[in-house]
């Protein structure tokens, strides 16, 4: 629900920029605040509706709102030459590789998207999965669906820099930098 609310705000901002550019005075910082608010709402909706039978119907890869810029770029009001879009969150996109803790909101958002779909899959198919025999597993559509989800999860993890991965990097390192909670979220997903 929060995602739909912020999506309406972004739509109004986009319409205003498109139809009345001389009257739209949002700075880059204000625009980025809207973007970050949108993705925080998306993550919150994922967290609150985890495992719900009918999770909200937004497909992550089809969302046209750009992903947040790094914390450093945001803090220093630097506009990167190009922005990551949700559809770019794969191993084929150079911008998506080696994401550090400064891209934590992007990492968490994508992680929650995958987590919700895995949890929904497990909830909806737990009886069928429990009754699968080893002979069924080679051709089962359920197993194929699980493999696709697992591949997405593995790809998501591979896009992260080693400094974001526990236990390769200690929690204390990120706590010292003020990123302890974010580091924990990423590694709990």
Model-identified regions with their sequence ranges:
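Charged, amphipathic alpha-helical oligomerization/scaffolding segments
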Residues: 110, 117, 148, 152-155, ...
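A conserved active-site cap/scaffold subdomain adjacent to cofactor or substrate pockets
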Residues: 136, 143-146
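Generic preference for well-ordered alpha-helical elements
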Residues: 31-35, 108, 146
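Aromatic-acidic/polar surface patches that form glycan- and anion
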Residues: 30, 100, 104-107, 142, ...
